[in-house]
Amino acid sequence: MNNKIKWLLKKNISFIKPIAKKLVSKNQKKYIYTWRIMLGKVSFKELFLNLEFFRDEYPGTFLSAKLYRKMFLKSDVTFAYNYIYPFDPLKIRFLPEGITALVSITPDYSCVLKSDLRRIKQEITFHNEEDKFVDTVYGIIDAVEAKADKIKKRQSCNEREHFLSAFFPEILYRDCISLDEAIQKILFYNALFWQARHWHNGLGRLDLILNQYYIRDVELGIETYESAKRRLKDFCLLLGYHTKFKSPGLIGDTGQYILLGGIDKEGNNVENDITYMFLEIFTEIKVPDPKLIFRVNDKTSTEIWNLCIKCLSNGCGSPLFMNETLIMNNMVEFGYEREDVWNLGTSACWEPLVIGKSSCQNNPFKSIVLCDSLYRVLKKGRDFYSFQSLLLAVKNDLAIEVPLVIEDLNYDYSPLMSLFDSDCLNKGKDFSHKGTKYMYQGVQLLGLPNLVNSLLNIKKYVFDRHLITLDDCLNAIANNY
């Protein structure tokens, strides 16, 4: 029936539109409505003809990998800003009820760039004769190769697109030999991660990762500082090409962060030409997506600080700053190994993880709005004779709320992410199902600084200086201050 409706729509038979709307499922209507909001003025016809759902009934199996292949082959390819990007937001992988999508993930793009799919197939460990994981990995590799072959065979009159298409599928089987290849390989896999419905996936430490390719190109006379900067500018603009589609809530909240600075594995500070290029690019283009996060420490140079401040002053919101020394020490105290935290990253905006060793999920549960506990305590109208008694009441309220948001979750599988995690391949386990070294679960605590400031103000003005009462505080909240 749907094929006949599509044929009639293509023929511009107007009376079919109301009929088509009645035959579309509720889920499809929801997505069409959402997509029209995201895109602006897009016709029902265009969305109905191009929007397609791929229901993955058996995540983590060979059947799922076959569905990936079908979806990859049907999805369109974007050529914009001088690079190929095979992400089609109108081809949607649909998860069964009860499966929680993987979000807020940062792949290790140093492994992605050096990856060889043939070697992965040869070296993957069989753990039993009927190894579901291995079959699924073989299937996902076939899906990736099929997509690369499709790109290779694309007909294009654009000389640059034709040039890039020639990279495929060869770059899937070796390390990159130029900055241009490295950028294209990152974009290829990044697009597939998005196509797999892994929202909020970051780019990681690109100044550390890309510098070796840039240096080689400069030594060979292939690139200059300015030409490399132009390529990285195109890279950033293309990542933001689908911002509306990649934003599950607020426009621009995509989790597409580029991490700069910080120490490398040997403890040396990373400040190179690529670092400077990204800061200069974001100062010039003034876009909110993607974003920069800068890992700072006591060795961060004054010149870098000045560039960061200049970039921030244009209103783009980048870079955010990470006090890496403090965060790494806290991660070790929490349970991460000291030898791993040098490769600290964030899962989206701020939640720490170890790049290449983590499938930590920091946004799967309902968020806790901390100031709500203070509000509930004040509404009860108890007489608090000391600040400590009020603080204890707020803590007790939080202790009641926290267990209410915790639940057991059945996560989606990611054979695609598993390809680039050595622990997954060695264990024979999927990225989100005990394959990675770390998989901590987190609950978002919203408004912690607000709660702290509120409590400090109450202590000062209510209990210490006796200028106002708790009833005054409650009235201020009720009347929007």
State where each predicted segment sits:
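Conserved functional hotspot residues or short segments at active or partner-binding sites
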Residues: 144
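Conserved catalytic cores of very large enzyme subunits
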Residues: 2-136, 154-174, 178-481
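Long acidic/polar interaction regions in large eukaryotic complex-forming proteins
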Residues: 137-141
